[in-house]
C-alpha cells in the first residue's frame, strides 16, 4: 500500500474519532477495508479506485465500532 492510500485511511478514520475506538484501532480497521477494496476492485469499471476504497474503509471502520460496543 502506498503513502497516498495510507493518508486516505487516516483521513476517513479521523471522522470516526471519539466513537469508542483508539486512533490505532481505527487505522487498523481502515487498512482492512483498504485491503478488501484492493481485492475486489475491477479496474475496467468507470468507478475510480479512491471512491471505491472509501466505501470499503468506512464499512470496516463502522463494523469495528459496532463490534466494540
Regions found by a protein language model. Give the residues of each.
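Alpha-helical promoter-recognition and RNA polymerase-docking modules of transcription initiation factors
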Residues: 1-69
Amino acid at each position: 500500500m502506498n503513502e497516498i492510500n495510507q493518508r486516505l485511511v487516516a483521513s476517513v478514520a479521523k471522522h470516526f474519532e471519539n466513537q469508542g475506538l483508539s486512533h490505532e484501532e481505527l487505522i487498523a480497521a481502515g487498512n482492512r477495508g483498504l485491503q478488501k477494496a484492493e481485492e475486489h476492485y475491477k479496474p475496467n469499471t468507470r468507478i475510480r479506485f479512491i471512491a471505491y476504497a472509501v466505501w470499503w474503509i468506512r464499512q470496516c471502520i463502522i463494523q469495528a465500532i459496532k463490534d466494540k460496543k
